[in-house]
Each structure stands twice: as structure tokens, then as C-alpha cells.
Amino acid sequence: MPHTEHIWRNVDAVRRQAPLVHSITNFVVMNVTANALLAAGASPIMAHAREEMAELVNIVSSLVLNIGTLSAPWIDSMFLAGAAAHERGIPVVLDPVGAGASTLRTTTAAQLMERVRPAIVRGNGSEIMALAGAAGATRGVDSTRDAHAAADSARALSRRHHCVTVVSGPVDLVTDGDEEVLITGGHELMPRVTGMGCTATVLVAAHAAVAASPLEGAVSGMAAMSAAGSMAAERAAGPGSFAMHFIDALYALSEADIRARVRVGRP
């Protein structure tokens, strides 16, 4: 199981190596997630044109596929980039935003799992349950299920697709179908700011680019997210100032912060 030293090693490696993270992501969060990657020490690129997917995959360190604002051309680009990245051994992280809320979202996410075979999928409880085929309530892109409720679905998804599944919430669950890790930290202000889940996904992608395994990358990315959320909340007066302080916290994050603010353990 990844421990604090592994988490810090990956935080430091992201800062030293500046992995290039390619995000095919949604309009709502492009600026938010690009700034988060920069603050963490990674380098973002947000490109969607299918004509350049093959070229870009040759130079990136990891790939994020985020289905938040889907359209047919973007779906084509996701399949092209995802297949090329998988073939080259580049870690792909899928964010199935709103899976279960519409047929398009659910079907696209399921097809990406089958055809792209991402190394990691990160979603909230409702999204993971929907992707695993469980009956779960989804209200837009917001979760009505926590990690505990989605644990069986997460394990099943990981075993079926040979991937790491991350269920984010007040307590985050990371599993590869056999090993399970719980991450406790963060703050209740985090779901009051748009793009926090999508930010978790890009941080996981940055860490996956430098980590020893997808499981370790997922755990360390989520732990960094939780620690920064806790730090930001101490200075924030509300959601607006939290968003600003969160970026600063990612930039300033230290090993001592991780040790003091995040608990990583088994269920």
C-alpha cells in the first residue's frame, strides 16, 4: 500500500519532471484544471481536434478523457487519442462525468472503458455505480452515493477492466480490484467549487505519469488533492476564496502538510 513517502516522492517528481498532461476535457473546467496542473508543477495541454491527436500523444506523459461536455467530434478525438496512448503505454485516466444521467454519457463512458482500456477511472460514487452497471441515482453531475456505497461497484469495475478505480467523496476509495486504499482529508467546501472532481482527475493523471504503478499514482494524486483542500479551507471565507487558496496550496504543498493533513489506510 502506498505510504506518505510514496506520496511525497510523486509530488516532488511531478515538480521536477513537469509531465505534460493532455486533457480532452469540458468547457466548464479547462481554466481551473490547467491552473491546478501548473501549480502542482505539471504542464497542461488542452487540445480536442482529431487531426492532431496522433501527433500530440507522441509527446505527452499522460492523457485525461473527461466527458463533461460531450459532442460527436470530441468523442471521436477521445477514441483516437485514447487508443494511441494505450498502444504507447501512456497512462489514460477517464473521468465519466455525469455517467448515469443520460444515455449519451453512460454509453460513451462504457465504450471508452472497453475500447481505450484506461489505466485509471475516477468518478464520484454515482458515476462509478452507473459505469459498473449498478442501479444508482445520479442527479446531473453530482453524486448521491459515497465511496462506501460504491465500493462493490468500484471493485467490480476494476476487475472487469483491469484498471484502478477511484471513488471520490468525503473519504476517497482507490482500488485495483484486490487492494483497497482509503484516503481521508480535504474539506466540506470542496464540492461547493466547480471543477474540484475534474481537478482531482488531472492531478491523478500527473501523478500516474511519474508513479511506480497506476494504484500508487491514483493514491498520491488524491492525497495531494485532499491535503491542498485542507490547507485552502484554513484561509478561505467561502467557496470563492477557497478556489484561489486551493491553487496556492497545491503550489506550496510540503511533505509535512501531507503527513499532518491526510490519512491513508485500508478499509
Swiss-Prot record:
ATP binds at R122, S168. It comes from the Bacteria. InterPro entries: Hyethyz_kinase, Ribokinase-like. Its cofactor is Mg(2+). Substrate binds at M46, G195. Its EC number is 2.7.1.50. Keywords: ATP-binding, Kinase, Magnesium, Metal-binding, Nucleotide-binding, Thiamine biosynthesis, Transferase. Pathway: Cofactor biosynthesis; thiamine diphosphate biosynthesis; 4-methyl-5-(2-phosphoethyl)-thiazole from 5-(2-hydroxyethyl)-4-methylthiazole: step 1/1. It is an enzyme of class 2 (transferase). One of its GO terms (molecular function) is magnesium ion binding. GO terms for biological process: thiamine biosynthetic process; thiamine diphosphate biosynthetic process. It catalyses: 5-(2-hydroxyethyl)-4-methylthiazole + ATP = 4-methyl-5-(2-phosphooxyethyl)-thiazole + ADP + H(+). Catalyzes the phosphorylation of the hydroxyl group of 4-methyl-5-beta-hydroxyethylthiazole (THZ). HAMAP family: Thz_kinase. NCBIfam families: PRK09355.1, thiM. Belongs to the Thz kinase family. This is Hydroxyethylthiazole kinase.
